[in-house]
Amino acid sequence: MKAAALLLLAALLTFSLCRSAPDGSDARSAKAFISHRQRAEMVRRQKRHYAQDSGVAGAPPNPLEAQREVCELSPDCDELADQIGFQEAYRRFYGPV
């Protein structure tokens, strides 16, 4: 009998603590969620060449990067580049740079 009374008391206590308060305390928790538009305004996407636009000196782009990617896509050129270097492997497969 005591166990049933304790169980009933625990259920009532849990119910009273879980109910939302009528004094508007949920207004604080509603501020935690923002709309998609507000979120998009708050978080700006970083530009691709941000360092060049802001005046901060960054590393200049490598002019051979496109050729390096072409050589990496060819398994034979990529293997040869591991052995003798990228520029020489590219020259042997695709002609002078």
Swiss-Prot record:
Residues 21-48 form a propeptide. Ca(2+) 1 binds at E65. SMART domains: GLA (SM00069). Gamma-carboxyglutamate residues are formed by vitamin K dependent carboxylation by GGCX. These residues are essential for the binding of calcium. It comes from the Eukaryota. One of its GO terms (molecular function) is hormone activity. The keyword Cell membrane does not apply. GO terms for cellular component: extracellular region. This is Osteocalcin.
